[in-house]
Amino acid sequence: MKHHSRLLLLPLISLGASAAMAAEDPKSGYYGAINAIETRQQAHNMDLSERPGIGSFVAGNEKQNFLNGSLAAGYQYGNGWRTEGEYVFKKSNEYTSGSSTFATSFNHMTTDSQRLMLNVYRDFMLTDKFAVYATAGVGIAKIDVGGWQGNDTRHFADSTQTNFTYSLGAGVSYEVLENLTAYAGYRYVDMGNVESGRNTFVNARGLQDENLRARLTNNEYLIGIRYTL
């Protein structure tokens, strides 16, 4: 997580804490929410992939930007705290890397990722309608990993992993109508390490000793609406 992203969280939390007594907390009750999420995903540490030992690692496309979404349901306790379950929709991406010896034969790592999270929120009411919030979440990410090398007949075996995942974030919210709140925020998500199976093709050394590895993280910018029953 970049330092500037962390610093963005501090003013929001400090502002909310200093004004925590400025307005009443919202009522308690169950709620549902829907989110649109602008995601900037990065595949870190691709140089840790098992390679044939010929040439040096060459970085390729390690970042993807895409729009995703999620659904959530939770409970608002009436004291500034909320908890919810959230499902983040499946999304497919592709990342590349190569070898200095085989300049035109890039490895293509494909990922299909989806998440189920338990999130905790602390709302700091600045007025009766406007609030800032901090959030943290833990959960699992199901990630299918595969890929190919050079051309799509040279496959790496598919692998499915279920990883521990965590998130940290902050944002602002506004009650636009009674029981209906709009919000916008940022969160950092770490989905852990992923890897494909080994190459199903025979490589330059006549062996099946390669795979594709990375650590997946997201910087997510979201807007959403929440309706409280």
Residue ranges and their predicted role:
Residues N163-Y174:
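Transmembrane beta-barrel strand/turn architecture of Gram-negative outer membrane proteins
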Residues P26, N61-L67, T110-R115, D158-T165, ...:
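Short sequence motifs at beta-strands and strand-loop junctions characteristic
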Residues A23-K27, A36-R40, A72-W148, L216-L229:
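Gram-negative (and chloroplast) outer-membrane scaffold detector with strong preference
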Residues H44-P52, E94-A103, D144-R154, E195-V202:
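Outer-membrane beta-barrel translocator domains and adjoining extracellular loop/strand segments
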Residues E38-G69, A157-T162:
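Surface-exposed strand-loop-strand hairpins of Gram-negative outer-membrane beta-barrel proteins
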Residues S92, T96, V176-L229:
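Predominantly the C-terminal beta-signal and adjacent terminal strand-loop region
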Residues M1-S28:
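Cleavable N-terminal export/targeting peptides
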Residues I54-G60, T101-M109, N151-D158, L207-R213:
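Extracellular loop and loop/strand-boundary signature of outer-membrane beta-barrel proteins
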